[in-house]
Swiss-Prot record:
SUPFAM superfamilies assigned to the protein according to its UniProt record, in alphabetical order: (Phosphotyrosine protein) phosphatases II (SSF52799)
Pfam short name (any one): Y_phosphatase2
Similarity field: Belongs to the protein-tyrosine phosphatase family. Atypical dual-specificity phosphatase Siw14-like subfamily.
Enzyme Commission no: 3.6.1.52
Protein name: Inositol diphosphatase DSP3
Native organism taxonomy: Eukaryota, Viridiplantae, Streptophyta, Embryophyta, Tracheophyta
Species, as recorded: Arabidopsis thaliana (Mouse-ear cress)
Active-site positions on this chain: C112
Site positions per UniProt: Transition state stabilizer: R118
Keywords, comma-separated and alphabetical: Hydrolase, Nucleus
Function text: Cleaves the beta-phosphate at the 5-position of soluble inositol pyrophosphates. Has highest activity on 5-diphosphoinositol 1,2,3,4,6-pentakisphosphate (5-InsP(7)), 1,5-bis-diphosphoinositol 2,3,4,6-tetrakisphosphate (1,5-InsP(8)) and 3,5-InsP(8). Possesses phosphotyrosine phosphatase activity in vitro. Dephosphorylates the phosphoinositides PI(3,5)P2. Hydrolyzes para-nitrophenyl phosphate and O-methylfluorescein phosphate in vitro.
Subcellular location: Nucleus
Enzyme class, UniProt record, top EC level: hydrolase
Amino acid sequence: MCLIMETDDHNGDVLAPPSNFSMVEDGIYRSGFPRPENFSFLKTLNLRSIIYLCPEPYPEENLKFLEANNIKLYQFGIEGKTDPPTPMPKDTVLDALKVLVDVRNHPILIHCKRGKHRTGCLVGCLRKVQSWCLSSVLEEYQKNAGLKWRQRDLNFIEAFDIVSLRQCLLSIMYQYHGYGFKRRRLAYEEENVKTPKPQAARV
């Protein structure tokens, strides 16, 4: 994948996105693990939150960046081992989805180590909530995972039960707002949505 790099006119910094960076939809982004050289680019996204899908502690340098920019960190420790393979924990993915679909956390970045498998599973489950057809969901996962896509990830996405998520988030719904074309957006009722508790946040 080719990195897009440009110059920030305000301070002359070179803006380099994290590996495998892309927009999922308005206000939702995905990538591999951000490095210090990516911080200037991340600042342009005006992030409110980051979903981190690895069990390892977040680097101190990254935590300082989050604190300086008032970004909340939600950590959901999902093992990425392949030998032996670690099953994707449904309850953990469900908890991460609750954070992801709450617009009060947007703009939000999802990342794991490489932004392919754990991130791809979470985005795939989001697409099912958005009522994407399964073939398109799996195609998106494979496109982002490249040659290293995993059949067990596809099986997890296919089997993921979105009914349980919808039952937990009755007050969150999708509405369409048209500006020449219809755009999907999340809405919520403030009094009915419980604020998820960050597992690691320094804000």
